[in-house]
UniProtKB/Swiss-Prot annotation:
GO terms for cellular component: host cell cytoplasm; host cell nucleus. It is found in: Host cytoplasm; Host nucleus. A motif (Nuclear export signal) lies at residues 83-91. Keywords: Activator, DNA-binding, Early protein, G1/S host cell cycle checkpoint dysregulation by virus, Host cytoplasm, Host nucleus, Host-virus interaction, Inhibition of host innate immune response by virus, Inhibition of host interferon signaling pathway by virus, Interferon antiviral system evasion, Metal-binding, Modulation of host cell cycle by virus, Oncogene, Transcription, Transcription regulation, Viral immunoevasion, Zinc, Zinc-finger. It holds the Pfam family E7. This is Protein E7. InterPro entries: Papilloma_E7. Belongs to the papillomaviridae E7 protein family. One of its GO terms (biological process) is DNA-templated transcription. It comes from Human papillomavirus type 53. A motif (LXCXE motif) lies at residues 23-27.
Length: 105
């Protein structure tokens, strides 16, 4: 920088695009093995998908930290009956603590 006031040309030295970058991928894959692996992965995903479909919905609980009163979010996946039990516990003596206060003890 020369002088008391910085100017834009002092900071922009060279704006020349690089055209020499090779964007071609020279990697070669064995296609028959990849297809076999894809089929195995697909078969393994089917039972997991069925389990996900049977699972209960996810609920987001927002409350305040019992120590610093910052926002605490808790994601819960449960049945309606068990969610009511959690609600009763939170309305009672169970209180949530934010991660920052939990590390302070």
């Amino acid at each position: 920088m020369h002088g008391n006031v910085p100017t834009l040309p002092q900071y922009i030295i060279e704006l020349i695009p690089q055209t020499e970058i090779d964007l071609q991928c020279h990697e070669q894959l064995n296609s028959s093995e990849d297809e076999d692996e894809d089929e195995v992965d697909h078969l393994q995903e089917q039972p997991q998908q069925a389990r996900r479909d049977e699972q209960h919905p996810c609920y987001l609980i927002e409350t305040q930290c019992c120590r610093c009163e910052s926002l605490v979010q808790l994601a819960v996946q449960s049945s309606t009956k068990e969610l009511r039990i959690l609600q009763q516990m939170l309305m009672g003596t169970v209180e949530l603590v934010c991660p920052l206060c939990a590390t302070r003890r």
